């Protein structure tokens, strides 16, 4: 059994895949396996994976017949893994050479710690140099060790980030949430924190490559799947006695997200096909209907533009579109 399994879900990642794999194969901790699953890429990603696997037996490669989304792809990788500890690295990101060693050492020596966060560095593209040397540390709340429940609470609004190494048993018990093609992996982070006795940090760096092609920045319909992912997390929080105190805070987050995503739709609906418009409106309506009004704070429901108006979906839509029109006119006058 290797000390660490690194899960890498790959989809059309040939541009940055070499940098990712090189950073993993050059780790100071050698007792590792790198489990790469190609999610039916249409570029040269699979060929690159096979090229690297032929040179280093620590790299395992599998491929999916059809595109299945990042959570399912990671679950396939998780099922292939055998390491004592598990972490994931996105195929366009990279690690400092000591990242796996430092995080594994914490888990080896701190028996009550089940999860170790990396030092999260955001690498932004310098358009002049064409490099990712513009780097900044994620603004995470500093801590040494905290309970898993506290970490779950802090991750609801990302006061701590979600990039970590975890003990294998926990990850197998709670695989990646597949309730949504995107964003549901964020739910898994919160569940992993909740399932951990204690959560710690290490100095090993995870470099997140922020660029226009990143899944979280792509100008497409993926953002609306956050509504599905949030519903799944709500169900989890409601189903455990020790997380129910978080339900009201999270429900207010959900409500603000519904309004924010309606605004996104208001700005872009003309660019969508009729089928896409119907899909977005269906998701927005389902989320609007599912909000538990008893959990919402009055400051988030009494303002124009934020009143649920549960008696009528049409009335709610009319309120939103008038509110967004007035807001746009106000912004133009500034």
Predicted segments, located by residue:
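Cell-envelope/extracellular polymer assembly enzymes that use nucleotide-activated donors
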Residues: 2-5, 33, 187
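A conserved acidic beta->alpha catalytic loop
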Residues: 23, 38-47, 66
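Donor-binding/catalytic cores of nucleotide-activated saccharide
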Residues: 91-198, 209, 213-218
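Membrane-interface aromatic/basic loop that binds lipid-linked glycans or pyrophosphate carriers
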Residues: 270-334
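Short, well-formed alpha-helical segments that are part of the catalytic scaffolds
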Residues: 12-26
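Short beta-strand/loop segment that forms part of the nucleotide-sugar
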Residues: 31-40, 60-64, 90-91
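Glycine-rich, basic loop-to-helix element that forms the pyrophosphate-binding segment
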Residues: 64-81, 88
């Amino acid at each position: 059994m290797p000390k660490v399994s690194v899960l890498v879900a790959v989809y059309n990642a040939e541009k940055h895949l070499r940098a990712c794999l090189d950073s993993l194969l050059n780790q100071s901790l050698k007792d590792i396996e790198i489990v790469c699953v190609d999610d039916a890429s249409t570029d040269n990603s699979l060929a690159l994976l096979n090229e690297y696997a032929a040179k280093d037996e620590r790299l395992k490669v599998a491929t999916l017949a059809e595109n299945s989304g990042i959570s399912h792809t990671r679950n396939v990788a998780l099922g292939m893994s055998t390491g004592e500890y598990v972490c994931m690295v996105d195929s366009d990101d990279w690690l400092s050479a000591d990242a796996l060693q430092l995080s594994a050492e914490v888990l080896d020596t701190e028996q009550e710690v089940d999860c170790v966060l990396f030092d999260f560095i955001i690498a932004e593209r310098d358009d002049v140099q064409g490099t990712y040397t513009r780097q900044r540390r994620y603004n995470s709340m500093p801590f040494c060790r905290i309970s898993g429940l506290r970490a779950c609470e802090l991750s609801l609004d990302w006061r701590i980030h979600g990039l970590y190494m975890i003990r294998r048993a926990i990850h197998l018990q709670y695989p990646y949430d597949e309730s949504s093609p995107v964003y549901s992996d964020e739910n898994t982070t919160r569940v992993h924190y909740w399932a951990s006795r204690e959560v710690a940090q290490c100095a090993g760096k995870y470099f997140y490559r922020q660029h226009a092609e990143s899944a979280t920045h792509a100008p497409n319909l993926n953002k609306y799947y956050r509504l599905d992912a949030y519903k799944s997390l709500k169900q989890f929080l409601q189903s455990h006695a020790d997380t129910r105190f978080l339900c009201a805070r999270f429900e207010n987050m959900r409500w603000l997200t519904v309004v924010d995503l309606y605004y996104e739709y208001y700005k872009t609906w003309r660019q969508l096909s009729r089928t896409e418009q119907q899909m977005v409106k269906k998701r927005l309506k389902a989320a609007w209907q599912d909000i538990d009004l008893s959990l919402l704070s009055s400051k988030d429901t009494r303002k124009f533009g934020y009143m649920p108006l549960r008696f009528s979906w049409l009335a709610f839509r009319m309120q939103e579109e008038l509110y967004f029109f007035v807001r746009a006119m106000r912004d133009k006058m500034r």
